[in-house]
């Protein structure tokens, strides 16, 4: 089966065989072989050869290809949404919003490129100072499985817009979405070699990251892999590395007037996408006392009624599955470990069907757990921590190596100002779900959540480097020479 796209040709992978399955039915929906190191090298060479001509195209010419890609996405929106839903397990309504985000990324990237890069000039003495930008060359994009269309798209689109050529290595759990996305680029008229698809798992990723022919790498995924890449690229200032990783995100709740609004926002923060967004709330900080008890009782009651089902189930569920049976097992094991260490199950997460990666929402009170693991449990498992006062809540919120997202539900603007000032996170929300962020806003975190902001508004900064010039059309001897220099 032809699973790789290199130099404008679909080719069969020669590496390890792997499959993609529907996480609920376990039906195989894609099969193929990954790219070997030799095939990775071929793709790098193809990208290197295609780069000069693509970079020399005018910005408007490149924009026209991107706009054709957006048109292709729109024409295949239903097909792509179904593909995303089938391969990830997320409900169709949510998969459709991902396709919309992919389309919207085109206009956002063009606007950001014009604002952040482009060309600027001004007089400087008898010359003109000019600032222009040039693409890096060949960049690799490593995509995640939770948003297999939208998140790699957030790197690929601005990279191509800036004039780079791209090597796309998607998650081995979502190869079908990647294949369909590349087909849309082909329909858009992207020249051969400008975008190359390298399917595969760990060995393919290692070969691509280690290839000396790449000029940079944009990664979205786990902190473990991201940390490995950071170590691998240490001492290589000639290569750009941008990492978007996970978080152990806190959502702090104060006593608010609208209890149900708080409950709904918590559910949207913790259980959207079956908890498989890097910005999902992992830790819910609730005040001690009667009001906090009432909030938790209401949260548990509502969460217990959340619809969980297959991606195409009708009426549509709120939550689909997690990505795989392996992921489901790991989450169930994590819950058991927390319970063994003293957590109290307010609402136990369950796996209704042993051979389906469907999990129901789980809520554990971990206040009594002496040493809570600082890790991202990537699924619908929310940990509750009771706090005594607001300073205690902020200290607990910051008690993590991560720093991606943090949120506050409060009726007090003064409290929010304090929270915003003292929180250590790249995204800080007030009375909005933790997973909410403007598509055009810089996205990323601090600490173990990553470095840089190589998507959305700041993407252009990482896809092109600035070149400062001092220019004048004529070479003229200055009227006054530097002391000590004589031309007579």
Curated annotation (Swiss-Prot):
Encoding gene per record:
astD
Annotated SUPFAM superfamilies: ALDH-like (SSF53720)
The protein, known as: N-succinylglutamate 5-semialdehyde dehydrogenase
Family the entry assigns: Belongs to the aldehyde dehydrogenase family. AstD subfamily.
GO-annotated molecular function: succinylglutamate-semialdehyde dehydrogenase activity
Enumerate the active-site residues.
244, 278
Which species? Answer: Pseudomonas fluorescens (strain ATCC BAA-477 / NRRL B-23932 / Pf-5)
Q: Which reaction does it catalyse?
A: N-succinyl-L-glutamate 5-semialdehyde + NAD(+) + H2O = N-succinyl-L-glutamate + NADH + 2 H(+)
Q: Name the InterPro entries for this protein.
A: Ald_DH/histidinol_DH, Ald_DH_C, Ald_DH_CS_CYS, Ald_DH_CS_GLU, Ald_DH_N, Aldehyde_DH_dom, SuccinylGlu_semiald_DH_AstD
Q: What class of enzyme is it?
A: oxidoreductase
Keywords on record:
Arginine metabolism, NAD, Oxidoreductase
Q: In which pathway does it act?
A: Amino-acid degradation; L-arginine degradation via AST pathway; L-glutamate and succinate from L-arginine: step 4/5
Binding sites annotated in the UniProt record for NAD(+): 221-226
EC code = 1.2.1.71
Briefly state the protein's biological role.
Catalyzes the NAD-dependent reduction of succinylglutamate semialdehyde into succinylglutamate.
Which BP terms does GO give this entry?
arginine catabolic process to glutamate; arginine catabolic process to succinate
């Amino acid at each position: 089966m032809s699973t790789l796209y290199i130099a404008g040709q679909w080719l069969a992978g020669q590496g390890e065989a792997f499959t993609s399955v529907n996480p609920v039915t376990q039906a195989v929906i894609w099969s193929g072989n990954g790219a070997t190191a030799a095939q990775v090298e071929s793709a790098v060479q193809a990208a290197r050869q295609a780069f000069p001509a693509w970079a020399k195209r005018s910005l408007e010419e490149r924009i026209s290809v991107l706009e054709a890609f957006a048109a292709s996405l729109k024409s295949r929106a239903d097909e792509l949404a179904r593909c995303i839903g089938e391969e990830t397990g997320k409900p169709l309504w949510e998969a459709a919003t991902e396709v919309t985000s992919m389309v919207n990324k085109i206009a956002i990237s063009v606007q950001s490129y014009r604002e952040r890069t482009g060309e600027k000039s001004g007089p400087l003495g008898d010359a003109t100072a000019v600032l222009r930008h040039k693409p890096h060359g060949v960049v690799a994009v490593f995509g995640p499985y939770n948003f297999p269309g939208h998140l790699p798209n957030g790197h690929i689109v601005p990279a191509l817009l800036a004039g780079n050529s791209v090597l796309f290595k998607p998650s081995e759990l979502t190869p079908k979405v990647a294949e369909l996305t590349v087909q849309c680029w082909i329909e858009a008229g992207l020249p051969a070699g400008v975008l190359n698809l390298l399917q595969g798992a760990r060995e393919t990723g290692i070969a691509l990251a280690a290839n000396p022919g790449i000029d940079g790498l944009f990664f979205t995924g786990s902190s473990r892999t991201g940390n490995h890449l950071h170590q691998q690229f240490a001492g290589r200032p000639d290569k750009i590395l941008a990492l978007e990783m996970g978080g152990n995100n806190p959502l702090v709740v104060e006593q608010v007037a609208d209890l149900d609004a708080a409950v709904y926002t918590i559910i949207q923060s913790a259980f959207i996408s079956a908890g498989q967004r890097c910005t999902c709330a992992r830790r819910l900080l609730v005040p001690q006392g009667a009001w906090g008890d009432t909030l938790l009782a209401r949260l548990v009651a509502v969460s217990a009624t959340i619809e969980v089902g297959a991606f195409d189930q009708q009426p549509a569920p709120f939550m689909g599955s997690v990505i795989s049976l392996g992921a489901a097992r790991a989450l169930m094991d994590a819950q058991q470990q927390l319970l063994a260490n003293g957590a109290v199950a307010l609402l136990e997460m369950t796996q209704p069907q042993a051979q389906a990666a469907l999990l129901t929402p789980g809520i554990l009170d971990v206040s009594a757990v002496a040493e809570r693991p600082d890790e991202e449990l990537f699924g619908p498992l929310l940990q509750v921590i009771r706090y005594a006062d607001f300073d205690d809540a902020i200290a607990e919120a910051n008690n993590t190596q991560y720093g991606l997202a943090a949120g506050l539900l409060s009726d007090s603007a003064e409290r929010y100002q304090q929270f915003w000032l003292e929180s250590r996170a790249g995204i800080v929300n007030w009375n909005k779900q933790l997973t909410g962020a403007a598509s055009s806003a810089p996205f990323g975190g601090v600490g173990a959540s990553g470095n840089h902001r190589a998507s959305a508004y700041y993407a252009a900064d990482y896809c092109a480097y600035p070149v400062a010039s001092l220019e004048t059309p004529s070479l003229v001897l200055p009227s006054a020479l530097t002391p000590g220099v004589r031309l007579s």
